[in-house]
Amino acid sequence: MASPHAENDMVPEMIDHRHLQMWKWLHSRSGARGNTSETSFESSVSVSTNSFDFSADMSRSIDSSSSRMLPSPITNFVTPSSSFSSHQMHDIYSLAASYLQAPPPPYTPTTAFHPHNAHQLLLLHNMTAAVQTPEDPDIDVVGLADTTNLVSLNDKEDEEKLDQTTESEESDRISISTTEECPLDLTFKPTSLDSPTSSTFIPLRPSVIIDHHIPKPHTSVRRSMSSVSSSASSTQEEVAAHFRRSLSGKWPKRCKVNSEEARNSPLRRRPSFNTHTSVSSLSVHSVSPTPPVTSSAQTIIVNNHCSDTTLSVADHFRRALLGKGLFDFQRKSNK
């Protein structure tokens, strides 16, 4: 029969008490198959005794966490008994209870972790994702992608416009600051002779009536007698119109009229001068005789050309007042 000391020599080192009890129980079972019941009983008793001693020694070094997990000390289950069956059953129950209540041993992987394994797994995942592309893409995803691209393009355009506006504002601010810093130029600058504002030409005062029908000098123009007569008549008409506008109802007041005839004669309307009877009636009631023309009488000159220089200013006013026909008739009768 093997001694307890020989069995203790076969126990591996660095093992906890639960595994030690299991190992001893298995060896006790294997030894009991080859020996008699008496030897097995003695070996079991020796094993139980050794386990009791070892468990008593290990119970002192168990930490608080292990003692909290075990509701009762292991020595209660491994007490030696006289009967073989009861001792064997208590030993099995104690081993099972201690094994189930103990935490599992820490997991130690068989192969060491290599740093390149994570990179290889990520590469494999990317390759499988690239191969398994969806045949029918989602419409919402495509629309969202297009909208995102459009918004990004619009944002880029807005940023470019904002940059341009800021640059223009900065350039305007710089130009304004430079103009404000420059002093005003108050020096007197003589105007050049070629400028239109400094022309020395002083326009002469125009005459009373300007004849636009007289040809310019140094021009060879051949015109018929009808055109010449029409130009002369138009000039005289312009002179007569000018004096008619100048009268404005003041010329009759300056005429010398007999005061007695003016009081006695009734007021009458001005007749027309188209008929012979009106001319004969007006010849009786004519105005005062025309004063003699003196050398100091002013003449009307139109553009230094005048067709009739015998008429004075007073004659022109009389002609405008009486009319052309009556004035010519009175003038002929006076001659």
Swiss-Prot record:
Transmembrane segments: none annotated. Residues 222-234, 275-295 have a biased composition (Low complexity). Residues 153-174, 218-239, 254-295 are annotated as: Disordered. InterPro entries: TDU_repeat (IPR006627). Residues 156-170 have a biased composition (Acidic residues). This is Uncharacterized protein R08C7.12.
